[in-house]
From Swiss-Prot:
The keyword Cytoplasm applies. NAD-binding protein involved in the addition of a carboxymethylaminomethyl (cmnm) group at the wobble position (U34) of certain tRNAs, forming tRNA-cmnm(5)s(2)U34. This is tRNA uridine 5-carboxymethylaminomethyl modification enzyme MnmG. NAD(+) binds at residues 273-287. NCBIfam families: mnmG_gidA. Its cofactor is FAD.
Amino acid sequence: MEYHAGDYDVIVVGAGHAGVEAALASARMGLKTLLLTLSLDNVALMPCNPAVGGPAKGVVVREVDALGGEMGINTDKTYIQIRMLNTGKGPAVRTLRAQADKRRYQEEMKKTIERQENLYLKQAETIKILVEGEKVRGVLTRTGAVFTSRAVVVTSGTYLNSRIIIGDVHYPSGPAGFPYASLLSKSLADLGFKLGRFKTGTPARVDKRTVDFSKMIEQPGDDRPLYFSYMSEGIKRPNVSCWLTYTNLETHTIILENLHRSPLYSGEIKGVGPRYCPSIEDKVVRFSDKPRHQVFLEPEGLDTYEMYVQGMSTSLPEDLQIKMLRTLPGLERVEIMRPAYAIEYDYIDPTQLKLTLEAKHIQGLFFAGQINGTSGYEEAAGQGIVAGINAALYVKEKEPFILKRSEAYIGVMIDDLVTKGVTDPYRLLTSRAEYRLLLRHDNADLRLTEKGYKIGLVTEERWRKFNERVEKINKLMEFLEENQVTPTKRNLEIMEEYGTSPPKHGISGKEFLRRPEINMEAIEKIFAIDGQFPDDVKEQVEILVKYEGYIEKQLKEIERFNKYEGKKLPPDFDYSKVKGLSAEAVQKLNAIKPENIGQASRVSGVTPADISVLLIYLESRKSEDNNGSEA
C-alpha cells in the first residue's frame, strides 16, 4: 500500500560517490534534501580499488574540493598512503594518488552526511521515478513510501539490474554482495530512456598473513605532507607501503589453457567492459607478446588483513583464481579472503542529458555517476557535485551551473558524455583535455573556488583561506617583477652552484626564474626570502613564470573556442531544415540536440564543413529576424 512519506526539495537516489556529493551540495545550498540508499552500510562504498586519485582523476578530486565538495577532505582524513605522481614530468600531468582505509572512508563520509544540516539519510529501494507531464515529482520505494520533490538526482552506480559472475556461477547482486536495484531500470525505460549494459570487475582480496613480501618490491608513499583538500593542512596520516610483483609464463599458461572457463570468452558476459582497466585474461590475450604484467598488492585498511590485488581483475572460476595467484612471486602460499568477480549492470545513454546532467525530456530529473556510463569514484564525484548543484539551482529557479572544457576536467568529462556518448565505461585521461596545462592539480582553487562561493557552496572559512593564498601568489609575483638579480659576488656563487651564467646587467627575478636551471630554491637564496612564502604559493608562481608563453597560447585558443560556445542553438531545432548538412550530421545533431555551436562541432560524425553550413544558416536566420523586427 502506497503512502506519502515526506516532501523534499531534492531527492538523491543512491549514496555512492556521486550520490553523497550531490546530496551534500544540495543540502549545503540550503535545500531540504533526502538521500536514499539500498543499505546504510554501503554509503560511499569502495567496492573496487581502495584508492583515490591518479592521472586526471586526482585533479577531479581537487576540483570537487575547490567547489566545496567532500571527497578530498574525506580522503585526507582516511588515507594510509599518499604519493605525488609524475614528479619528473611537466605540471600538466602531476597529480596525487592516495590509498584509503576503505572502512574508515565510509564511516567518515556517513558521519559527515548524518551531521549535515538539511540532509536526511534513509535506507530504501527506489523502484519508480514519479513524473507528471514533463516534470519529475518524486520517487516510490519498494515498501510503498512516496517521497515527493521538485528535483530528483539518480546516482544508482552499478546496482541497476546487476548480477555477479564468477566462472559459471552467476546471481543477481549489487557490488560486494550488497542488495541490487531490480525494478528501477524498468521505470527508466518506461519513461523513455535508452538503456545499455556494461560490465566491470574487481580482483580478489587476499590475506596479508599469507604473503611473502620479501619476494616483492616495496612501494612506499611520500614522506612529505600532501593533501587533496585546500582545507586539510596539519593533518598527520600514516604511511603504509604497497608492494609490486609480476605475472609470469606459468600464470599466462594457466589463463590461456582455461579460456573456455572464462565467462568473458564463453559469451556469458554480454556487457562491455572498461577499455582502460582490462581483466588479467584480457591482458594476456591482447598483449600476448608481453612476458609479464605488473601486479600491486594494496592494503585495504589499518585494521584488516585484506589486501587488494591490483592488476588481477578477473571473472575466472574461484579454483583457477587461487591457482593463478600462487604462480606470482610472494603469493606461493596465498589465501583468498574474497574472490574476484565481474559485475554487469544497466546504464543510461548519457546523450539523453543536458550539460547540466538534467534529462532533456523530463524537467528536474538529473543523473550522475556510473549510471551515465562512466567508471571510477572520482568521475562519479565530479558528476555528483555538478548534478547536485544544478538540482538545487533548478529548484531555486536560478541559472544553471555549467563547467566548460577550458575550466575543469569535470567540464571535459560531462561534455564528452553528453556530446559523444559512450561505447565502454568512460574513464578520464589527461589526453582528453585540450587545455590540460590550464587544468592542473595545483590551480583547481584558482579556477573554481570563486564559482563555488557565488553559488553558496564554498564556506566563508574556505573563501578566506583562498583569498589569502591568492594575495600571497600576487605578492610573490610582484616581488619577482620589481626586484633585480645583479652579478654581486654572493649572487655569482649561487649562480655557479646552479650552473647558470651571470647576467651582464641586472634582470628581474621573474626573468631569472624563466631559466630552465633555476628554481624557487635558487630564487630564495638570491633574495634571502627563505621561509617567507608557503610551498604551494612558490610552486604556483614558478609554474606561471616558466610556462607563461604556453599558458598565454592556450588562453588565446580558448578565446576562439568561446566564440563557438557562445553561439547558442535552440533546443527544439530541426536540423533537417538546414540545406547542405550531411545526412549523418542531420541524424546526429537531431539526436544530441547540442546547446551551442561548440558542442555541435564535437559531435562524432559532424565535420568542419557541416559547422560552416550551420554557421551560415544561423547568420542568415539572424538577418531575417532583424529585418523582420525592423519592418
